[in-house]
């Protein structure tokens, strides 16, 4: 069975760090994918991008048009299209049950920043000491993407980014679907810190308490 290496674009709402990197470092991304493919015999690469990112799609399709080992696949924009099992099925047709790992189906799935970190380490001998973090939401003073060193606290990052607006109601580390509410801003940025989402009163869902019955 042919091995497949898939780069997935993040599908969480609000997060744009991987999208910006696809626009700004497409050649490095493709070279990083080739580094991974070189580790296996008869391996093919797939870059899976949702169809709401036409500029990134056009750039990567242009760069891989004559590349026999890499294919750009355009996926429908829906959540959780970028989840590991879903992206393997939609790009390869291979099904993975709850007891299987991607490797059992001959697949590896990584995100954009991981593949770029591989490129930096192998091709530029640069260690992985930072990542791009999305700061966004209606209550963020200056929403944009920041390259942040590991170990910097969330509080320090927010201060560097201009802080929060007065209407900030809730902070989430990560995206709105899989992220965690933040209660301590002194926690450090790590390799898994994808974003800080500052939500206003209008963005926070309110529920009226009801009786718990069947």
How should each PLM-predicted stretch be described?
Residues 189-205:
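Glycine-rich and small/hydrophobic secondary-structure elements
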Residues 23-39:
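Histidine-anchored nucleotide/phosphate-binding helix
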């Amino acid at each position: 069975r042919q091995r497949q290496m898939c780069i997935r674009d993040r599908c969480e709402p609000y997060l744009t760090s991987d999208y910006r990197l696809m626009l700004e470092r497409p050649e490095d991304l493709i070279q990083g994918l080739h580094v991974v493919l070189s580790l296996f015999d008869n391996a093919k690469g797939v870059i899976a991008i949702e169809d709401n990112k036409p500029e990134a799609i056009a750039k990567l399709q242009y760069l891989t048009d004559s590349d026999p080992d890499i294919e750009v696949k355009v996926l429908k924009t829906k959540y959780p299209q970028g989840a590991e099992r879903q992206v393997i099925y939609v790009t390869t047709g291979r099904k993975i049950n709850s007891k299987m790992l991607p490797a059992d189906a001959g697949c590896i799935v990584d995100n954009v920043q991981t593949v770029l970190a591989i490129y930096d380490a192998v091709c530029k001998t640069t260690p992985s000491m930072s990542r791009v973090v999305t700061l966004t939401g209606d209550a963020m003073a200056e929403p944009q993407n920041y390259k942040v060193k590991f170990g910097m606290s969330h509080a320090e990052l927010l201060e560097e980014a201009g802080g929060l607006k007065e209407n900030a109601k809730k902070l989430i580390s990560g995206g709105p679907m899989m992220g965690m509410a933040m209660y301590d801003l002194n926690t450090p940025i790590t390799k898994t810190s994808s974003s800080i989402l500052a939500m206003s009163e209008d963005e926070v869902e309110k529920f009226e308490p009801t009786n718990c019955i069947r």
